Amino acid sequence: MSGYTAFFNNFLGKSPNWYKLSIIVFLILNPILYFLISPFIAGWCLVIEFIFTLAMALKCYPLQPGGLLAFEAIAIGMTSPAHVKAEIMASFEVILLLMFMVAGIYFMKQLLLFAFTRLLITVRSKIVLSLSFCLSAAFLSAFLDALTVVAVIISVVMGFYGVYHKVASGNNFDDSTDITNDEKIKKDQQVLEQFRSFLRSLMMHAGVGTALGGVMTLVGEPQNLIIAEQASWGFGEFFIRMAPVTVPVLICGLITCVMIEKMNIFGYGDKLPRKVWGILAKFNRAQQQKMNRQERQKLIIQGIIGIWLVCGLAFHLAAVGLIGLSVIVLTTAFCGITSESTIGKSFQESLPFCALLVVFFSVVAVIIDQHLFGPIINYVLSASESTQLLLFYGFNGLLSAISDNVFVATVYINEAKNALHAGIISLEQFELLAVAINTGTNLPSVATPNGQAAFLFLLTSSLAPLIRLSYGKMVYMALPYTIVLTVVGLLAVEYILPGATKYFSSLGWITALPV
């Protein structure tokens, strides 16, 4: 074996050769574009290349190729280490959340699996079950972070998959097996594929549910807090101002959930195979039969900690990550988990994504330093007031689908506020634009996994390859939701929002405050 062959085999491991060559071409091309043609073009190429690594997540985890591209971008001067650090520190709460909250949810898996297994066994209608997942995710995301909600549902779905896979492989419920190996399930491949399709649809319904609920409240998404702070809105006023857009969108989103399940389109409609239902029902009975007082106490303790988790997040008693750390401490202490190796397993899911998110912040720093969104922002602000709402909504949605939601919302709300202080727009127009920015950032961005952090977390989780959920599959399955949420949101911003805002103001429900 030659040195070149050995190097090429080592580079990005078992990834396809065409993929390795693509990354090498990107690494050669970017400095040439940056130094000889245009930093602006080089910046946009980097963004497209990073999206490519996300799209190929099942070929190679995006951390390595994306990290190489980001490292090179910093090395050639497209951004600086100081700026990357500033972007990381600005989103440090999100990193804390990933480090501790996802690990905390791991230790509540027993309670979650118990509760959702009962739901899955009791509710036989796929449409009702899909609505249950979508609505519960929307409700939870209105008060909790969407990443936390998705982490909970991933944990549950992983539990379902693991139970069936063990039995289908000829093992018992308590046996330790490799759930990534399907060699022993050859005779049940059709059942397994149908089960995977069933789980994919539940995950997508829940994922979209987090967007439907997260846009409605002050605490639903990180960018909501930024927008509310700039507009001087409290919890109640934020909800009322968003309602003319978010309520019609929620209703239409739920109708979409029912229709796509009923019509068996866009990868939805597959029901839970009867054989899998039987295994899960048997698992539920076995768990109840062997449940002694100690096991019941563990469920009660996890339930109490779950109440603390919801209350702590809803009332912002501490940073999300710190509440997650408290969940780790409380569940492990009172459920008797003291082994370092067992505790270490809880961090396996979140830390690779945490590292990937830091790489993503490097790309965001390049977007800012190279002013990649500058022409779009200038065009929107130069438009007439009558078209500004639509343009703000539309371009926020477009940019949020390829970049960080928090970054896009921050840039646009700051530009809108600068225009207000410069006398370019009125206070009333600024308040309408704030709603357009918030809804535009949150709703159309369900189109792609990199549009929503929760979707990106799902795509790069260990569950995604198990249920065959790729980037392309997520985009395809999200398409009906993307169309409905975007169009209904756009129509609501244009035709319902201005009149409803005036009506709420006349009732005294909202007040225009100087900002």
UniProtKB/Swiss-Prot annotation:
Q: Does the keyword Repeat apply?
A: no
Record's subcellular location: Cell inner membrane
- Provide this UniProt record's keywords sorted from A to Z: Antiport, Cell inner membrane, Cell membrane, Ion transport, Membrane, Sodium, Sodium transport, Transmembrane, Transmembrane helix, Transport
Which terms does the record give in the GO molecular function aspect?
sodium:proton antiporter activity
- What does it catalyze? 2 Na(+)(in) + 3 H(+)(out) = 2 Na(+)(out) + 3 H(+)(in)
TM helices/strands, residue ranges: 23-43, 44-64, 88-108, 119-139, 143-163, 202-222, 238-258, 303-323, 324-344, 357-377, 389-409, 447-467, 477-497
GO cellular component labels: plasma membrane
Q: What is this protein called?
A: Na(+)/H(+) antiporter NhaB
> What species is given as this protein's source?
Mannheimia succiniciproducens (strain KCTC 0769BP / MBEL55E)
